[in-house]
Amino acid sequence: MESCWLTMESYQAALVVCIVSGLILAVAGYGNVRRLACEFLLKPPKRFRDDICEALLRGPENDQKPVLVDFGWRHGAVRRQMLLASAKASAYSNERHGSKIHISPDDIARGRSFADALDVHRRSGRILFGFFHPFCNAGGGGEKVLWKAVETTLKQSLNNIVVVYTGDCDTTGARILSNVEHRFGSQLDSERIVFIFLRHRKWVESRTWPRMTLLGQALGSIVLSIEAALCCPPDVWCDTMGYPFGYPFVSWLCRIPIITYTHYPVVSIDMLDKLRMMPEFRNSPTLWAKFLYWRIFMRCYTFAGSFVDLAVTNSTWTYNHINAIWSRTGNVSIIYPPCSTENLVIENAHDMWDRKHQAVVIAQFRPEKRHALILRSFSNFVKKTGSNMKLLMLGSTRGQEDRDYVKKLEQLAYSELAIPKESLEFITDCKYEKMKKYLQESSFGINAMWNEHFGIAVVEYAASGLITLAHASAGPLLDIIVPWDIEGDKQLERGSDKNRTGFFFKDRSDPDFCKITAEFPTLEELFVRADQLTDEERLAISQRAKRCVLHKFSDLKFSEDWAQVVDRTIQLLHTLRNDKVE
C-alpha cells in the first residue's frame, strides 16, 4: 500500500511539473519551442553532408550490400534533403531499411554533384506533395481519388515530387503502383513517387477501438500524422482520407499548407439531429451522453479545420456540412470524384429500348444501404401489378457479418415476402466486367440509402443508360440526378419532365421523414410509375442522364479541377516562404 501511495504521489508531482512547465512555455516560449521543433524536423544536422560524403567515398563493401547512413531521430530531415537532391526520388523510400537511409546507386555515381545538391541553402525548385492516405492500396473510390490526384500533381510540373504516406506494410511500393495501374489505369511517373511506410496504422483502425471509436481513431490519427512528418516532412500536406485531428500538429511543427479532400465529415449536424429525433432521446441518459460526446467532438473537429488552407469536398452535401463546420477556413470547394464515366457511356445505335425488363441494385451488403426497404417495395409492386420485372442485388461482402446479412435478406425475400426466385437474384462479390454487363442490359438502377454523401453507384447507373430510382437526399438529389439541358449541355435550376434524368422517392423509415411536407412518392409507387414509361420516355431520360454524368464526373474533369488546386497550393507555398524570409 505504501509503495502504491509513493507511486501516486510521484505521478501527481510529475503531472504538476508538466502542467506548470507547459504553462510557462505557452506564455513565454511558445514561439521559440515551435521554431526549434521546425528546425529539428526540416533542417538536417550541420555535418550531415560530411557524413554522406564519407559514405560516398567509402562506397559499398560489395555489389550486394547497399550504402546506408543513419541519422537517428533526424533521419526525416536528411531523407527529405536527399530526395530533393536525387535524380531518382523514389529510391529514398523507407520500405526496406526503416530509419536508415539507402543512398541510391545513381547518386553514388554522381558523387560530388550529388553532395553539392544537398546544400540546404540551395533551392532545387522541387516541391514535395505529401499525400496522407494510410490505406492507399485498398482499391476503392477513395483510392481512385488519391491516385488520380497524384497523377495530375505529377503531370502539372516535373518539379513536383509526391510522397505517399501509407500503412500498407505488407506489400511494396512497386506492387502498389502495379495494382493502381491495373485497377484504375493511371499512368504514373514512378521515379517521382516516394512511399513512406507508417508502422502505427493500427491506431486508426476501428478494431483497435471497440469503444469510443471516434475518439480513439482521432488520437490514433495524431500519432500517425506525427510519425509521417518525422519520417519525411513535406512542403504540402494533402489529406485524401479524412484524418483531420493531425492537422494542428502538422501545422505547428512543419508550418506548411494543408490541403484536404473530404469524402464525408467525421461528425455532422445530421448525426446530431438523427440522435435528437429518436423517440426515446429525452428519457435516455445514454443517448444524452452520446449527444454530448458528439457535440464536444464536433467542437474539436471545428478547431482542427481551422488549420486547413484549402478544403475540397466530393459533393454538395459534404460541401454544405464542411462549409458550416469549418467556416473559418473560407476556402471550401467541390471537386467531384473521378468516376471514369467516359468508359461506361455507350451511345444508342438505334432509337429503340431493347434492354431487359429488370432492375439492378449495386451497393455493399450493409444495413445502411436499406436492401430490406427495396425488397418490401418490390414485393408489394409485383403483387399489386403482376409485373414480370426482375430484381438483381449486387454487392461486395467484407466479412462474415456481411455474409450473414445477405442470408437474412434471402430469408426475408424468399420466405417472408414470398418473392419468386426467378424474380430476384443475389450476386455477391461480382467482378467488375460482369457488373458492367448487368448495367448495360438492365433498365432500372435503384439506390435507397438515406443521405448518401455522393453515390458512385448512381453515377454508374446514369452513365450506363439506366433509369435511376434514388432516395431523395444528399448526393443523388443534389449532384447526380439533376435537371439537365441536353442542348446547352448544362444543369438547370428547376426540374420538369422535359429535363428529367431520373426519379426520387421518400420513405416513412427515413430519420427526417415528415408526412406533412412529403413531396416525393414511395419506392413502391415509383416502381409503378417507372414500369409505365414508354420507350420514347425511357430513351430521353437515359440520354440526358448520360450527358449529365459525362460532363460532371469524368476523369478528365477531375484532373482539370485538381490541376487548379495544385496551382493555388503552389501560390500559397510561395507566399508562406516569402513571409518566413521577411
Curated annotation (Swiss-Prot):
Enzyme class: transferase
GO molecular function, one term: GDP-Man:Man3GlcNAc2-PP-Dol alpha-1,2-mannosyltransferase activity
Membrane topology: Single-pass membrane protein
EC number: 2.4.1.131
Disulfide bonds: none
GO cellular component entries: endoplasmic reticulum membrane
Lumenal face residues: 1-12
InterPro entries named among the record's database cross-references: ALG11 (IPR038013), ALG11_N (IPR031814), Glyco_trans_1 (IPR001296)
Intramembrane region ranges (chain numbering): 241-261, 462-482
Keyword set, alphabetical order: Endoplasmic reticulum, Glycosyltransferase, Membrane, Transferase, Transmembrane, Transmembrane helix
Subcellular location: Endoplasmic reticulum membrane
Segments passing through the bilayer: 13-33
Pathway assigned in UniProt: Protein modification; protein glycosylation
SUPFAM superfamilies in the cross-refs: UDP-Glycosyltransferase/glycogen phosphorylase
GO biological process annotation, one example: dolichol-linked oligosaccharide biosynthetic process
Reactions accelerated catalytically: an alpha-D-Man-(1->3)-[alpha-D-Man-(1->6)]-beta-D-Man-(1->4)-beta-D-GlcNAc-(1->4)-alpha-D-GlcNAc-diphospho-di-trans,poly-cis-dolichol + 2 GDP-alpha-D-mannose = an alpha-D-Man-(1->2)-alpha-D-Man-(1->2)-alpha-D-Man-(1->3)-[alpha-D-Man-(1->6)]-beta-D-Man-(1->4)-beta-D-GlcNAc-(1->4)-alpha-D-GlcNAc-diphospho-di-trans,poly-cis-dolichol + 2 GDP + 2 H(+)
Main location: endoplasmic reticulum
Cytoplasmic side: 34-240, 262-461, 483-582
Purpose: GDP-Man:Man(3)GlcNAc(2)-PP-Dol alpha-1,2-mannosyltransferase that operates in the biosynthetic pathway of dolichol-linked oligosaccharides, the glycan precursors employed in protein asparagine (N)-glycosylation. The assembly of dolichol-linked oligosaccharides begins on the cytosolic side of the endoplasmic reticulum membrane and finishes in its lumen. The sequential addition of sugars to dolichol pyrophosphate produces dolichol-linked oligosaccharides containing fourteen sugars, including two GlcNAcs, nine mannoses and three glucoses.
Family statement: Belongs to the glycosyltransferase group 1 family.
This protein's name: GDP-Man:Man(3)GlcNAc(2)-PP-Dol alpha-1,2-mannosyltransferase
Organism: Eremothecium gossypii (strain ATCC 10895 / CBS 109.51 / FGSC 9923 / NRRL Y-1056) (Yeast)
